[in-house]
Amino acid sequence: MNKKTIVIINNEKIFTEGKDFYCVNFDMKVLSEGLGAYSDVEFIVRKSKKKGGHKLNLENIKSASNIIKFLYFIFKTFKTKNASYLLVDITPYTFFSFLILFILRKKIFVYLRSNGHEQWRHILGLWSVWIYHVMYKIVTSNSIVMVLSERLSNKKDFYLINPSRLDDLWF
């Protein structure tokens, strides 16, 4: 039986050491490796210069040093037939990826773990929240939304999930 392919697209920064990859965020390790038990996982992330504490046990990781290379990796995934795309959080990187995937009519899931409105307000200030809100509305209106808390989605049809419950049945 052939496994489905899931392309995880995330703003996470990954450190590369030879053929080994390390991340800071343990949740990303658990999510990517958990989905790897059910599917072929391609992981597209940003490159880091700092080694994280969690070694990823995945083979197909593409880490980009800039947005152009990041989007190039997205285009390269189109060789894989019937791939599903999982955007983890909404950031400028995942938003531009979403636009490409949406235009090319790919199956897109978005997984929201935290309130981006609050994060943008904290990082960039109150003036920036409208930028996130525009990205949020566009992405959530045109994808299947999975959230960790009901307060993360204004959409009527979203899936409230436990992170350990993301498996092959979703994709």
Locations of the language-model features?
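Short, well-structured alpha-helical segments in soluble
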Residues: 72-81
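N-terminal subdomain of nucleotide-sugar transferases
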Residues: 1-50
